[in-house]
Structures are given as structure tokens and as C-alpha cells.
């Protein structure tokens, strides 16, 4: 079972930074995850939330500010933001990046950046339109469906996504076996428990193995490393 480091943040390595991605690209980690979205002036930033509220105590949406306004707001709380172009220039590890594409519209300038990127991306898409755009130049084992609804997997499989993401708290209604039977090549599960959130737990990873998951997204890279050592993966 593949382990994917999800939006990791550690002391000295803020989330969605090159430092956090390179820290997370540890032995045994299959891919590292980050997010990209569009600012109001059409720039592409590596940033998870749709607003600045959680990180900068600023309620403005990312889509409603310029890149410079975003940088100023984050600088007030000693944070920064990088662009997609900076990521593809500065990331030096060989571990693939699972790029969660928050935009559902396949803007031509965004797709062009994807197509010429010098790093290995696994594209995580939320819409069939974005899936169709990246499918033109991306093998299906490098396209993951971050589908908004648990019942949408047939559409994403039909569109050419090779990997389907499920949430851990969906598993009482939908299982990897069900999604495999519908034609998915791989099913990855996003850890999510009331106690640990998306950090993940050894118990969850053990369970995912028993239900035939092909991968798991975890935020606690140290826990993942210990689990891999225990299972002889590293």
C-alpha cells in the first residue's frame, strides 16, 4: 500500500511550502501532496484554503485578492505563499508531487503550465472538465479523482482517472472493492478520524490494508515512517 504525505507542516516547514514537501519526501513515501488555486489576478499559488482566514485572519477569498495582496496579508503573520512556477523551479526531490487542483475550470494558461512542468506531477482533479484537460498528456496512473461526492466515481473512472480518492469516514457506505469493481485501477483513502483528523493512525492504515486499499494519504509523516518500519516497507 502506497503512503502519500498530505499537506505536511512541521516546525520550520510551513504547509504548502517547498520545505514541507521536501521534508515529507522521506524514504517509503510514494508522493507528497500540495494544493494549487487561482488568485484574483490570475496567478497560481500553492495554497489549500479558499480564503485567507485560517492562516492570516483575513476573510477575503483567494479568488478575490491579487498575489501581492495575498503576500502582504500572510506576511503580517510571518507566513508566505509560493507560486506554481516557483514550486516547479525549486522542488528538487524525485518523489512525485500529488497536486490537488482546486480549480475546476481548465484555464488554458494553467494547463500549459502543467504540460511543461519539469517535475513529476500526479494531478488530483475535482471536476471531469479538469480531468479531460490533463488526460490529453497524462497517463491515467498519474490522475487522481478528488471527487466532491462519494457517488461520483463512475464518472471519473469513465473520464480516465486511474486513482479514486475516498475519505475514511465514507467507508461505511463505499469500499475500495466496490470502486475497483467499477473499473478503478487504484483506490487511495484519505485518513480522517475524530481523534486524529487527517494525521492518520496505525490502526487506520492496518484497516486499509485489510480492505484492499492501494494507497493512503496521511498528514503525520513520522507516524507513517514508524508504520512502514513495523511492516518492513523501509
Question: What positions do the PLM features span?
Answer:
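Phosphate-group recognition and catalysis centered on beta-loop-alpha active-site segments
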Residues: 1-234
Amino acid at each position: 500500500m502506497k503512503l502519500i504525505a498530505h499537506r505536511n507542516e512541521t516546525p520550520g516547514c510551513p504547509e504548502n511550502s517547498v520545505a514541507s514537501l521536501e521534508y515529507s519526501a522521506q524514504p517509503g513515501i510514494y508522493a507528497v501532496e500540495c494544493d494549487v488555486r487561482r488568485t484574483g489576478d490570475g496567478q497560481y499559488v500553492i495554497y489549500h484554503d479558499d480564503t485567507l482566514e485560517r492562516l492570516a485572519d483575513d476573510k477575503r477569498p483567494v479568488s478575490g485578492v491579487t498575489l501581492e495582496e495575498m503576500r502582504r496579508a500572510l506576511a503580517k503573520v510571518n507566513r508566505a505563499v509560493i507560486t506554481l512556477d516557483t514550486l516547479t523551479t525549486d522542488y528538487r526531490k524525485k518523489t512525485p508531487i500529488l497536486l490537488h487542483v482546486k480549480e475546476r475550470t481548465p484555464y488554458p494558461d494553467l494547463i500549459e503550465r502543467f504540460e511543461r512542468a519539469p517535475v513529476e506531477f500526479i494531478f488530483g482533479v475535482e471536476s471531469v472538465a479538469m480531468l479531460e484537460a490533463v488526460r490529453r498528456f497524462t497517463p491515467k496512473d498519474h490522475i487522481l479523482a478528488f471527487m466532491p461526492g462519494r457517488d461520483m466515481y463512475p464518472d471519473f473512472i469513465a473520464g480516465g482517472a486511474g486513482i479514486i480518492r475516498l475519505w475514511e469516514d465514507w467507508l461505511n457506505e463505499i469500499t475500495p472493492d466496490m470502486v475497483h469493481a467499477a473499473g478503478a485501477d487504484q483506490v487511495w483513502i484519505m485518513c480522517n478520524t475524530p481523534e486524529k483528523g487527517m494525521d492518520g493512525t496505525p490502526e487506520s492504515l492496518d484497516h486499509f490494508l485489510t480492505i484492499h486499499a492501494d494507497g493512503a494519504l496521511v498528514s503525520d509523516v513520522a507516524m507513517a515512517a514508524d508504520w512502514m518500519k513495523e511492516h518492513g516497507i523501509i
